[in-house]
Amino acid sequence: MSLQMDKIYVKVHELKFVNNLERNSHYVKIYWDDKKYKSQTKDGGCYIFNETFLIPITNIYDQKDQIIYVEIWESNLLNKQCAYTFFTLNSIKIGQIIKENITFIEVLKKCTLGLSINIVRNQKDILFFNIKELLPTFQDQEIINAVWKNEDEASIIKQLINLNTIDGITNIGNYKNSQNYNETLQKPKENISIYKSGEEIENSYIPSSTPEYVSHYIYKGAGENSSNYINKTKDTLFPTYLNNYAYNNNIKNVYDTPNGAHYSSNNNSGSNNAYSNFDHNINNSPKNNVPFSNSDNDKIFHYSRNYMPSPNSEKMLYFSCGNKKKALLIGIDYCGTQNELKGSINDAIITNELLIKKYNFYDSSMNILKLIDNQTNPNYRPTKRNILSALEWLVQDNNPGDIFFFFYSGHSYKKYDYTCIEKGGYNQTIVPCDFKTEGEIIDNDLHKYLIQPLKDGVKLVSFIDCPNSEGILNLGYKYKLKKEKWKETYNPFHVLADVTQFSYSKINEFPTEINLLEHVLITNNIEALTYHYMIQSIHSYINLYNKKKKKKIFLMSSQKFNIDRKFDFNHILKNSNSELGQQKNIIKWKKNKKK
């Protein structure tokens, strides 16, 4: 079901720079549907625009989710782009963005811009959003009723607030500058965003009031031009009575918890706000943000599953709510080579958004580093040198309470083991994009750069999407899915930190436009994810598209734990291995090799 829309109504308010000494001239550019819209140029450190744009929407029934870009430019002899952000059409359609101070993605300067972005059909819609901006404390229905009865903003405001003092007001601009408006009506919005870095700004660049996914990357799946990752999930993945339309219009419940609100006490493993499901106010979600549009009253059903994780039996050493939270994401498609893959870059991009939107990773180059081989900047291509440097960056200066995430999607090979440590005589490797000239990265080097520097009280979660990768981080224990028990691996290294590794390999028939982690972490319908649920879901999902040989999912860990442990980025297990590592096996292997 598609909603007919006429125009995107954009209002540009105040531009602020983190550097208060900024005095250059700046303007705002908006790009939509191959057209450019530009604001006036402001200078002297005062950047109050108060400009509106009515941008027509074409190709309403086009399947791809179009993107509107908003950029900040410095006006000079050579104009320079300072910062940018963008929104999907789907997010604008569903979520109201009314005078939000949005932090832009930094190019040259850090800045925030007050924005209102909504979909309108007629003049009454425009009046509604203007009044909503002026009188944020009033309910939507109150404003709608007033708009229907009046033709201008002053009359609407008069009816709503019932003030005799505005009888003589004929211009709404005069009213906004009046004492009554400034003292009575203009109430600043409460800042509900909590940033782990300690810095507090007015709002994230994705406004907390926006319920839909807001993409900051353009990526294309195989065979389609899609940039809305929610809509790429097949209907068959949902319960038969919960269709795609119901899901898309209620996906906001996944993201309705503000940053930082998902932290709980160590003993509270039964409920967690980060794992919102469709039971949470599903019938109260608006169909769209156009107040005067007709909409079908589709019946929305509840989806529920009586599945809760058991309380953690292990002792928690640290509970992270303010320490470092960093991620390294590597996606390699080996574009233009005989070894070309499809979907690895896409997986890295979508995983980046999952970390930001659901697990509250801060969207900054200081917190998330993404290496993909279609990157034009050579410093962000997944070469061997860049990968090793990125591994060092990820875990450097780690301290108890820090949380790290590592994702790799690409090829893996086997290489002869000259050290005689590996059981089968071969090292597992990951394959950089320049492997033909620089070679692969073996598992021992991965362990040296990524695992060995980690201290007790640090947590690392890793997802490895490549064949035969179960032992690629050389962790001590492997979980046997059929026997439902842990087994010690051959000659493991001793690891102090709380490290877990999910290893799997998608087949060629697996749809490249569908991200596996997206399905497991976003489209799940239980209150809290557990490690047991994770491995069962990944295993089932991969083999859903495999008609020949079943693929396996491996869960590796630096220590044993209750498999019903909740999967999150907060709780960290205390090291339970005083000694782990069997050097005698190295000697034994060498003796057998000589024979």
From Swiss-Prot:
Keyword Protein transport listed: no
GO molecular function ontology, one term from the record: cysteine-type endopeptidase activity
Disruption outcome: No developmental defects in mice and mosquito hosts. Not required for ookinete apoptosis.
CDD domains: C2 (cd00030)
UniProt keyword annotations, A-Z: Hydrolase, Protease, Thiol protease, Zymogen
Gene3D superfamilies per record: 3.40.50.12660
UniProt key word DNA repair: no
Regulation: Activated by Ca(2+).
Enzyme Commission number(s) from the entry: 3.4.22.-
GO biological process, one term: proteolysis
GO terms under cellular component: cytoplasm
Superkingdom per UniProt: Eukaryota
Residues at the active site: H411, C466
Role this protein plays: Cysteine protease that cleaves specifically after arginine or lysine residues.
Family designation: Belongs to the peptidase C14B family.
Quaternary structure note: Monomer.
Protein name as annotated: Metacaspase-1
